[in-house]
From Swiss-Prot:
GO terms for biological process: gibberellin biosynthetic process; response to light stimulus. It holds the Pfam family 2OG-FeII_Oxy. The active site is at 297. Residues 205-306 form the Fe2OG dioxygenase domain. The keyword GTP-binding does not apply. GO terms for molecular function: gibberellin 3-beta-dioxygenase activity; metal ion binding. Keywords: Dioxygenase, Iron, Metal-binding, Oxidoreductase. It catalyses: gibberellin A20 + 2-oxoglutarate + O2 = gibberellin A1 + succinate + CO2. It comes from Triticum aestivum (Wheat). Converts the inactive gibberellin precursors GA9 and GA20 in the bioactives gibberellins GA4 and GA1. Fe cation binds at residues 229, 231, 287. Its cofactor is L-ascorbate; Fe cation. This is Gibberellin 3-beta-dioxygenase 2-3.
Amino acid sequence: MPTPAHLSKDPHYFDFRAARRVPETHAWPGLHDHPVVDGSGAGGEPDAVPVVDMRDPFAAEAVGLAAQDWGAFLLVGHGVPLDLLVRVEAAIAGMFALPASEKMRAVRRPGDSCGYGSPPISSFFSKCMWSEGYTFSPANLRSDLRKLWPKAGHDYRHFCAVMEEFHREMRALADKLLELFLVALGLTGEQVAAVESEQKIAETMTATMHLNWYPKCPDPKRALGLIAHTDSGFFTFVLQSLVPGLQLFRHGPDRWVTVPAVPGAMVVNVGDLFQILTNGRFHSVYHRAVVNRESDRISLGYFLGPPAHVKVAPLREALAGTPAAYRAVTWPEYMGVRKKAFTTGASALKMVAISTDDAANDTDDLILS
């Protein structure tokens, strides 16, 4: 289907299907500065992406080791039905297959957090990414998606029903994983309950869903589906199709590790605010999405974080006798720091780090308040 004339000139839209080459607007330098290795090796191999089975009685220990060493892991045995994951992927594929004119009804304008278009972080870069995205809040799912389906017909109702079912499953899973994270920090069951009673981390966590479509690319060596970045919130579940493309950055030596596409598995990424909450014991992970010549790829990011007004600082229980490494910051405040970091090349986490002397005078802030 040809692109309507009025859309071919719209800066918010690029017709990936019609592209026979990668234009300079979408060509990224430095994509091959580091080697790429396969992360599907057997457990124990240095580049094998950790796998955590939530049914394992030692799952908390496995979560802790993966969060400390990688900042990410593959999650299996999570209890989310496979048939639901299949329906979610099919619904996402159908949405991105809509005509351009329909998708553009929901385009994300500058300053908007929800809608259709490029990834939200794309505004920080001069080059465009080889992908389309759609962001919405599960709490406002039906109103957000009315922009895309204003008549609220069958497709709208079906899409909403599938995403609402997925949200219910994922929100319950997030609570279970949060508990595993806290146990991995060394908290007892009673301490986990006390932390939740006092600070209500699980109760108040907010969720955002971001859908991605990475079209096949005529020259994947020049294009990038999603720029390397860390997630800003607590942690993220990534549901990816059976086409690999997610890569994690590893040091010693520097390299990109391709996450294997495992049926039914989800990827969990630790975010920056969780690194702050755990005082650096668990660290966020740089990751990116690459494209290929043969196949489209779909993914869904389910992002968890604190409410906008909540200040996040290291948990007392995470300090283990060490000083606080970060100052208290709200999510919006941290996003402002990240914006400065993107434009200057600095590290956002280093910009909110505090010195030992500062930590000695800042103990009253060492809570999620």
